[in-house]
């Protein structure tokens, strides 16, 4: 019986699952928005939120813990320099999962995972069209 086990296996071995979640976490921290399947998005949220909470306190020990989980120096720098201060006053709930319908090939439920309060990127094509 598997009572009390909240982890989704996602039809992968533990090594594959951990590597996939690490890659997805790096992508989310880099781009601040990614598209994936709904079960993966829900698991990703469980991994990313504690990382951002860790970044709110920029100690050497926390940076080493973050590097141990991310394995990417650039993402650790971004996490502690940008994301930690951005969410300093927010007590959790750093990610948003938006359902996006179903994938064409296999009808898998898709979702958009994004960091809340991310800066809006201005669309230069819309500004150019307005100018004309």
From Swiss-Prot:
Gene Ontology cellular-component annotations: cytosolic large ribosomal subunit
Stored Pfam families: Ribosomal_L17 (PF01196)
InterPro entries per UniProt: Ribosomal_bL17 (IPR000456), Ribosomal_bL17_CS (IPR047859), Ribosomal_bL17_sf (IPR036373)
Keywords annotated in UniProt: Ribonucleoprotein, Ribosomal protein
Molecular function terms, GO-annotated: structural constituent of ribosome
Biological processes per GO annotation: translation
Membrane spanning residue stretches: none
Annotated HAMAP family: Ribosomal_bL17
Oligomer status and interactors: Part of the 50S ribosomal subunit. Contacts protein L32.
Entry similarity comment: Belongs to the bacterial ribosomal protein bL17 family.
Protein name listed in UniProt: Large ribosomal subunit protein bL17
